């Protein structure tokens, strides 16, 4: 139905269908910006969080710069950085994440060099859910004039993430905690570190020039936008705003705690959490004598959807000692119920 009413190409043409569509896209931009405390013009629609992170990393980091990442990063950070190390002479240091936030910040601080350009880190691990001290890391970046690029894929919509937390660039997915459609993402910048375009093409503005426009969002958005996805993202953000991130976090954490309480009674199960650390609502585990893939397949046969393997985050699995086989990951949503969690726990017990 949305495409019947808003099937125009935003910013291209002056007829009514396009005008209606453009208004909806701008409203979605305003909704996303307001939710994270950013400005609409500095809110960029992306294909996903990986696209947003590539925009930020490749648009900020230059040849011979130095960057610091954590040892919990997703390949959406690790692979762009690795490519820049190979191809542009960029230097990269990896800071270990501790259960003690002060130790984590100290590890990042100890790796700062005169040519450090950016700290690039996840707000919460997609493997274990461990929450990094991102506000303190943002303060560290500000102290040293370093850009902080934040991967918010596992945190946005669940944790109260705001641009006022201090990150310079926030990247996130639309299809996870924001309940939008797949193929959507966001990059929000405070513009203190100008981002060079990653893609070049039509914007519907300054079309006579060969260069990309020098103003946002046009400078970083080119080609036809994912209109249907953007409208779904607007609806998802409105839902999260109405429900409340605190309520979502509480419900999902209650689901995790229920499963954890059941898993702790099963000697054959290993759970990858450490006392003293803060966690987003994610539980990673393994069952003795079963690979993570076998466990997930058996649970799938019983109607439970869990992801197995390395979760595109080999550094995190190396850190917790599961690089050879990965883990099984449970990540509930606001729509899961406690009876469903109990049924999952019983299914795991009976494997």
Predicted stretch roles:
Residues 1-351:
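Pyridoxal 5′-phosphate
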């Amino acid at each position: 139905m949305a495409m019947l009413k808003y099937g125009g190409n935003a910013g291209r043409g002056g007829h009514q269908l396009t005008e209606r569509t453009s208004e909806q896209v701008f409203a979605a931009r305003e909704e996303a910006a307001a939710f994270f405390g950013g400005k609409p013009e500095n809110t960029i629609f992306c294909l996903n969080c990986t696209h947003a992170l590539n925009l930020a990393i490749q648009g900020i980091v230059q040849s011979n710069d130095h960057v610091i990442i954590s040892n919990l990063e997703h390949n959406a950070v690790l692979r762009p950085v690795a490519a820049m190390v190979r191809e542009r002479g960029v230097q990269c240091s990896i800071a270990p994440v501790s259960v003690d936030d002060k130790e984590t910040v100290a590890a990042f601080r100890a790796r700062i060099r005169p040519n450090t350009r950016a700290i690039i880190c996840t707000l919460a691990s997609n493997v274990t859910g461990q929450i990094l001290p991102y506000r303190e890391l943002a303060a560290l970046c500000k102290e040293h004039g370093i850009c902080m690029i934040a991967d918010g894929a596992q945190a946005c919509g669940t944790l109260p993430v705001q641009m006022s937390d201090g990150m310079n660039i926030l990247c996130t997915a639309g299809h996870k905690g924001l309940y939008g459609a797949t193929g959507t993402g966001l990059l929000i910048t405070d513009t203190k570190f100008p981002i060079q375009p990653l893609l070049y093409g039509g914007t519907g503005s300054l079309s006579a020039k060969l260069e990309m426009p020098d103003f946002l969002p046009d400078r970083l958005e080119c080609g036809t936008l994912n209109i249907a996805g953007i409208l779904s993202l607007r609806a998802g953000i409105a839902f999260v705003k109405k429900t409340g991130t605190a309520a979502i976090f509480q419900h999902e954490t209650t689901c995790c705690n229920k499963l954890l309480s059941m898993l702790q009674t099963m000697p054959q199960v290993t759970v990858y959490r450490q006392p003293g650390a803060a966690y987003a609502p994610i539980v990673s585990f393994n069952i003795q004598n079963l690979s993570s893939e076998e466990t997930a397949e058996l649970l799938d046969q019983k109607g439970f959807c869990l992801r197995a393997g390395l979760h595109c985050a080999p550094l995190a699995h190396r850190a917790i000692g599961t690089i050879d086989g990965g883990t099984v990951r449970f990540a509930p949503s606001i729509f899961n119920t406690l009876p469903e969690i109990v049924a999952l726990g019983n299914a795991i017990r009976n494997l």
